[in-house]
Amino acid sequence: MPRRILLVIFDLDGTLTTVESLWTFLHNAFHTWDNGRVLEQKYRRGEITYKEWAETDARCWTGIPMNTLLKALNQIPYSNGAKEVFQTLRSKHVKTAIVSAGLSILADKAARELGADLAVSNELEIQDGILTGGIEVKVSVAEKAKIVKDISTRFAIPLQEIALVGDRANDLPIDDCLRIAFRPKDDAARSRANVIINDDNLSGVLPYLE
């Protein structure tokens, strides 16, 4: 018997948007990728934690005006079918959330424009319309399981009635949830998934959420 899904939790980068990494996208937009590449390599080698990586990355953007950041974000397109998916889920009274190890300024924008019930991500510090270089790290790649459980408790929806949609294994951390890999980036994501969607249209997830 198909399971009933009452809450869908989406990854953002590479899932709801076509940009695989907002961090890399912004480094390229702000011409800070030389530093960003070094920091990413340190993180991949295990020399710094995700929190340290995010904090040091954010400092690269100290002094950038908020308007410049917003102009860059407006260039990021949603994945094909994203709006349709949220409209359909809303019509069926299914709750939706966005959990991203990226940045809240894009996650919150996506939540407003797509109609998600909740967004959780990392928050850049802004003062007088300028990036201060600070950041509040709320989501790391290793903490998504805890955040999913917190959201489950918040909405009083059991894990068995939650679907997770993402492009990487860390987006699909809990076995009790339905795990949908959308445009999976590697074999680890494929092996974690109950369902694999290789099509570029996010609406391919809908038959598994009914």
Where are these regions (language model features)?
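Active-site neighborhood of HAD-like aspartate-dependent phosphohydrolases
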Residues: 1-56
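Acidic, Mg2+-coordinating phosphoryl-transfer loop and its flanking beta/alpha structural elements
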Residues: 96-101, 159-200
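Short, basic/glycine-rich phosphate-binding loops at helix/coil junctions
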Residues: 53-69, 125-131
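Short, acidic/turn-prone active-site loops that include or flank metal/cofactor-
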Residues: 121-126, 184-189, 201-205
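Short, acidic loop-to-helix structural element flanking the phosphoryl-transfer center
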Residues: 66-98, 102-104
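Anion (oxyanion) recognition and catalysis
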Residues: 90, 112, 190
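Substrate-recognition "cap/lid" segment bordering the active-site pocket of phosphatases
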Residues: 109-162
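Phosphate- and divalent-cation-binding pockets in alpha/beta enzyme and binding domains
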Residues: 25, 81, 105-109, 173, ...
